[in-house]
Amino acid sequence: MNFNNFTIKSQEAVQQAIQLVQSRGQQVIEPEHLLAGVLKVGENVTNFIFQKLGMNGQQVALVLDRQIASLPKVSGGEPYLSRGANEVLQKAVEYSKGLGDEYVSLEAMLLAILNVKGNASTILKDAGMIEKELRSAINELRQGQNVTSQSSEDTYQSLSKYAINLIEA
């Protein structure tokens, strides 16, 4: 897996997953850890998507944390990707290409997590995430732009972050 093809935020999400595994005394990086990483580093992206889908982000984080706490603890050894986590990353690469992106974004990772069967997918689906609506929210978030740089996520919704819409005010 070439992480140079991931955006900086996606790389940070994977790094957060690794740190979470280590801090919890676990060894296997599961899709749940990847989802936790995406939620932690991609707040702007996930908050926008969750709001559009009518999801409670805090509830998702709570259920996810309980699920991660229930995973087996192992002392010693380096963290490694489970088959499910590896499948998530492979699918994220595929989804990125399908979206016309040059880099794997947090949105592609979220799409992949949703579509790889397992606990992380179930958590998202139980909270109300549906692929068609997720894709629609991603399109709205991106406003027709593709991920063409490693820092593309920082440009999403930049106008709404720093300006006031006088029509809405």
Where do the language-model regions lie?
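Histone-fold recognition with a strong bias for associated Lys/Arg-rich disordered tails
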Residues: 1-169
